[in-house]
């Protein structure tokens, strides 16, 4: 079972699905904002601005899930009860991802976001294929389509940037840890 595969059809209702979707989107917003703050701290304003833009896009996804949730009472799900196999939701960009570096380029930020969005697509695709109820499959397909649109957007953005040159992370005067 992959990290993005729902566990044992644990999402059995629309309400459970929407609670998971809301958690995924909120975690993505928080992670992008955290990454933007880190890039600002390290005087990397271009990448910080990109992460802020990604957070804004994810906030639109939160709004979409909230709209879908109208009329539903969403359950509280403890962090260890989510239907993904990792400590982070499938859509959250990993804070420990390869390429996460204070001197990272926009290319890295977009590639990181693209990987996270593809994991979100995979999560919803699997759920749409495994769910026992048609209403859950329908919402999973809708959420998957939203994530696919984000993947397409990010692929377009990535095409505008060249991979950074070899040695991009070398710093003649690296920051020192503070005690």
Model feature map: region roles:
Residues 1-179:
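Iron-associated oxidoreductase/ferritin-like identity signal
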């Amino acid at each position: 079972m992959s990290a993005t595969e729902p566990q044992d059809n644990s999402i059995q209702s629309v309400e459970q699905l929407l609670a998971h979707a809301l958690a995924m989107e909120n975690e993505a917003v928080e992670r992008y904002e955290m990454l933007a703050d880190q890039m600002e701290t390290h005087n990397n304003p271009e990448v910080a601005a990109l992460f802020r833009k990604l957070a804004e896009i994810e906030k639109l996804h939160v709004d979409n899930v909230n709209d879908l949730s109208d009329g539903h009472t969403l359950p509280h799900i403890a962090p260890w009860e989510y239907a993904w196999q990792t400590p982070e939701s499938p859509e959250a960009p990993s804070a420990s991802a390869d390429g996460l570096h204070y001197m990272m380029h926009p290319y890295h930020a977009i590639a990181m976001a693209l990987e996270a969005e593809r994991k979100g697509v995979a999560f919803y695709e699997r759920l749409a294929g495994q769910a026992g109820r048609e209403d859950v499959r329908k919402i999973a397909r809708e959420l998957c389509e939203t994530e696919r649109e984000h993947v397409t957007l990010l692929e377009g953005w990535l095409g505008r940037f060249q991979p950074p040159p070899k040695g991009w992370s070398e710093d003649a005067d690296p920051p020192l840890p503070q005690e």
